Amino acid sequence: MDARISNYVGRVGERGVRVDRHTPWGNPFIVGRDGSRSEVIRTYVRYLASNEDLINRIEELRGERLLCHCRPQRCHAEVLALVANGYRTIEELVELVTQ
């Protein structure tokens, strides 16, 4: 799920919108404690889908540079970028991660 074609996903400290754990967009699931990197990203997809407030605000992220500490590794910010820019619906992503 690499969304760099639509949103640049960078590291905190650059200019952009932070989506790390210090924001409502952050992934509350931790690599190691809650599973592998892929598992916590999949869990985040389901979490996002169940969070009506975030889904209602997702367009705030459209076209923005999303910043998280994970980059350059795979990151939940890629999920946010895909949905915010209309490349995937949250329902499509939930279906993908539950297959």
What are the functions of these language-model segments?
Residues 1-99:
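Catalytic phosphate/metal-binding cores of nucleic-acid and nucleotide-processing enzymes, i.e., regions
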